[in-house]
Amino acid sequence: MPLFVVTYCHPDEAGWRQHVMAHVGYLKQLLGQGVLRASGPMPGEADRRAMLVIAAPDRAALDAIVAADPFAVEDLI
């Protein structure tokens, strides 16, 4: 299964705070499914940023996984 590295940028601090717990819940779901291989914040950046390593069969599947993230649903990444 191919691995993809995804970078999130969160310029909206208030939106991030409002939806971070839903995002974490989604990441836990992906982790349990073996889809999320690693993730974490990128400290030292001006905006909040994170990097995710996601296993997906192709780019279309990756796009669907990212689109289902509560941060994406709320247009925060």
Q: Where in this protein do the model-derived segments appear?
A:
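Conserved, structured core segments of small domains
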Residues: 1-77
